[in-house]
Structure formats: C-alpha cells, structure tokens
C-alpha cells in the first residue's frame, strides 16, 4: 500500500511538473535544491526566481503576436508591468530587461521611473500608463514627467474631475486616456466599478472637454475586469461592450488608437492548474477584430497590464515547522516559524490559494494537518477555502520539529515546507 507523501502527490497530480521535481526525497524548485538554500540562509525565507519573470513576459508576447498574425490583426501589442505588484529593484530590473512598458498607481511610482531612467534602465519614449485615483502629488508628478520629455505618458482619467486637475498641471502637449466604469461580476458586492467614467457619459464628456482642448489627444480607452481574463460569459460580455464603445468613440476621435484590456492572466496557484492561455489570447484578438470589422473601424493597438502574472509565479516562501499540536481527534496543527498575517496576508485576507509542498521527507507517510502562524490572532492560519483549510504533509516525528528545547536539531530532522 502506497502511503508515502511522494505517492500522494504523484498519484493526485501530474508530477513532476515544470517548476517542481524531487531528488533524494527533497524538493527542487526550478532546478534549485531548496534544502541547500535553507541550510545556507535558514527560515523563514522568501526567494525570487528571476528567470521566471522574463519567461512569463516572453510567453505572453508570443501568444499575442501569434494571435495577431493568425487573425490578420492590424494593431500592435504592448506589454505593461504593474509596479504595484512588486517595487523591488531586482524585480524591476528583470522586468525592464524585456523592454516592457510601465503602469503606475501612485505618485511614488513616478519617482521610481525617474530613478530607473537615471540608471539607464528606462527610456523616455516607453509608455507610462498612469492609472488609479490621482491625488495632487500624483498629478504634479505626472506633469513633471511630461515637462521632462517623457513622450508617451498617458494619464488615464478615472473620473471627470481629474481632467481639470491635469489641465491645470500640464502645460505641454500630452496624450490622455479614459477608463470605462465596467460592470462588476454579478456576485460582487457592487454593480459598477468605483473607478472610471460611465458608458453613457464617455462620448459627451469627450466632446465637451478633450475634443475642445488642443493640448490633449485622446489616445487610449481602458477597462479593467476585477476577475482577470477568464473564459466566462461575464468577461466576454464586458469585453464586447468596451470594444463597442471604442468603435463609437473612434468614429469621432481619430487620435484614439489603443485599447487597454486591464485585468491580468491567472497564475498557477495549485498543482492541478489548467488554463489555456493561447486560446484566450486568440479569442480576445479575434473578438476585438470582429467587432471593429463590423463597425468599419481600424483595430486598436492592444495594451495589457500584467502584475501578478509577471511576478506571481516567481516566488517561494519557505518555513520550518516549529511544533505540532493536536487539539482534538480531528485537528492537528503544524506551527510555522512565522505569521501568515504578515508574511502571506493574501492567504487569510482574501483566501488566496497557494501551492504548498513539503521541502524534505517525501519518503515519509503523510497526514492531514492545518498550518498555523506564530501570532495569538485567531485568523493567523492558512485559510484557503479551496483546500478546506487543511493540507497534507509528511508525518511529524518527535525529532523532526524544532522547539526552544531542541536548539541543536539538525536540518534533516526538521520538517520544512514551501508556499509557491
């Protein structure tokens, strides 16, 4: 009877996988022996595998470029990275190696762009898509970029009042965009996005303001779907509505030539993850082209804003199991050497699921456990509804957890886990 942890994983999922394989009962992540990393640096530890960032960027580029070629689509594709997903210098350095553009969300992001330009990592003709609600400092920083010769700064109007603020702050010619207030998913708490301008107001607003102002050119129409790019009736309906608005606006605004399809690709958060990126990309391009052809409008350049997709599959967080506690005959707790609330807040705040795997002891029998954090807060545990809050891990023995009473425990005697 196969009751080992490695048997459970290999029989439940297709395993090994692209990112994961096991040698000598220890987990390798993208070819990296995680136990060697733990022995050198200890836990808790977060690592980033930078090549995965470039790999995902190049994959998305390839999918869109192939889809554009197959559909005989006349527009271009532009990949934008959302800085809010990770501001770390080493992440931005890796991202910008791929010649991508930047999407910003705050005044702070503008300061980062200026530093990146000073370091020779960002060109002044790269696109800078300025999203988010804009406080005055953000407005002023955008205006400073324009006056400093950044030629493709595109502030996206999230409300009508921002137009007057930008008009006062910016003195030089500038491209501009409008965000559509998309309808939210039916099960969401609200009907319409809090950001953006309503469908029915966009054309009247353009004609009464931007059209009359020679300083601004309406370059881009932007919509954002909270659920991301998914094969659902809701997503395709919102895409269709937004492209139709684009066509109506293009007929009276010749400068308009770009559609920003906000909301990113999903990322791999479970070993059974299955998503057809190529199909979705081809469908997006095909549907935009079909609607534009029907309306007699030239296809727009396509911009995407990928944050989580860019960096979400490139990180691992490694923990030690400090102690095991049995509270009753059904609940067995493995206590990690950190806090989920501070280290992985998405796991408890929005029930974000992660791939959880043992780093060592794959030859041991497995058991069902709950993962708990160090703090006294009752919510400090791995709280993924998709996993029913419990995971399976190699059985803990008396010598493979570490406590204050066992300061000299060797690494091979301690159970380590990774969240990816």
Task: Please give the residue ranges for each predicted region.
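Structured core elements
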Residues: 101-103, 129, 154-156, 177-179, ...
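Solvent-exposed alpha-helices and their adjacent loops that cap or buttress functional pockets
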Residues: 121-122, 147-149, 169-171, 187, ...
């Amino acid at each position: 009877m196969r009751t080992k942890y490695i048997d459970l994983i290999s029989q439940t999922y297709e395993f090994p996988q692209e990112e994961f394989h096991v040698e000598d009962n220890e987990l390798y992540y993208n070819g990296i022996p995680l136990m060697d990393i733990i022995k050198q640096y200890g836990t808790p530890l977060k690592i980033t595998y930078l090549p995965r960032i470039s790999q995902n960027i190049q994959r998305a580029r390839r999918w869109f470029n192939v889809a554009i070629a197959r559909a005989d689509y006349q527009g271009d594709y532009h990949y934008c990275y959302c800085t809010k997903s990770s501001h770390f210098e080493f992440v931005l350095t890796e991202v910008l190696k791929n010649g991508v553009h930047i999407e910003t969300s705050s005044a702070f992001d503008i300061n980062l762009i200026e530093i990146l330009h000073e370091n020779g990592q960002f060109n002044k003709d790269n696109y800078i898509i300025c999203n988010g609600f804009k406080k005055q400092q953000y407005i002023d920083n955008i205006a400073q970029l324009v006056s400093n010769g950044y030629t493709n700064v595109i502030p996206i109007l999230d409300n009508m009042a921002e137009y007057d603020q930008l008009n006062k702050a910016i003195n030089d010619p500038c491209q501009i965009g409008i965000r559509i207030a998309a309808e939210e998913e039916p099960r969401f708490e609200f009907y319409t996005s809090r950001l953006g301008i309503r469908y029915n107001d966009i054309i009247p607003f353009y004609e009464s303001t931007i059209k009359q102002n020679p300083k601004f050119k309406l370059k881009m129409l932007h919509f954002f779907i909270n659920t991301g790019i998914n094969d659902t009736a809701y997503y395709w309906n919102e895409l269709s509505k937004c492209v139709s608005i684009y066509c109506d606006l293009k007929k009276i605004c010749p400068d308009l030539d770009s559609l920003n399809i906000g909301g990113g690709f999903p990322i791999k958060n479970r070993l059974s993850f299955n998503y057809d990126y190529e199909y979705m990309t081809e469908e997006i391009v095909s549907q935009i082209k079909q609607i534009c052809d029907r309306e007699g409008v030239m296809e727009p350049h396509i911009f995407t804003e990928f944050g989580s997709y860019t960096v979400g599959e490139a990180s691992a967080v490694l923990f030690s199991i400090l102690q095991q506690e049995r509270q009753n005959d059904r609940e067995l707790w493995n206590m990690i050497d950190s806090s989920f609330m501070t280290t992985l807040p998405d796991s408890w705040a929005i029930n974000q699921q992660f791939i959880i795997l043992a780093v060592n002891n794959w030859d041991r029998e497995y058991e069902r456990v709950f993962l708990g954090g160090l703090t006294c807060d009752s919510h400090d545990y791995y709280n993924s509804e998709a996993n029913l809050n419990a995971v399976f891990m190699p059985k803990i023995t008396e010598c493979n957890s570490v406590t204050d009473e066992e300061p000299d425990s060797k690494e091979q005697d301690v159970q380590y886990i990774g969240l990816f």
